[in-house]
Amino acid sequence: MMQKKKRWREFFGTIAIACLLVFLAKIFVFFPTTVKGASMKPTLQDGDKVIVNKLAKQFESYGREDIIVVKTDNFYVKRVIGLPGDVIEVRNDQLYVNHEVIDEAYLYSNKKQAEKKLMNLTEDFGPITVPKNKIFVMGDNRLISRDSRNGLGLIDKADVLGELAAIYYPFEHMKIIN
């Protein structure tokens, strides 16, 4: 009888520790969220469930081309294009960062769709120098995305919540984000 009580106590103790670890990880390390809207298509779909790494904010480990979640007037999932001091420009549908051509492979399917409509995916703009403590972000679906070009503005580093780590639902979209 004592043996059975001891096993139950160990079992519930293990469950309590596991719950505490999950709770602490959610507070300090990651959080789940849902992608809303089509501004990151085709990389992310409306309704995708994702995990965001909060440590990326603490250590500012996100960089150009990483996908981040920011909180301004709302929550936004966007791609980092420019960091403080970077010079950002788009000419003839080509992104330049610090006067170097950037190959945005994640835009190929969107560029093909824009070409079929005889449109540029991204309007010309810049050059823009990203100020200290700000970042420049854009959505992958440039035709409809509200981002640093058109209404969202430059993002305060303090408004970054974290970097996208994984898509966990729907299962056919499941993947780790590099």
Task: Label every PLM stretch briefly.
Residues 24-41:
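Aromatic-capped interface at the extracytoplasmic side
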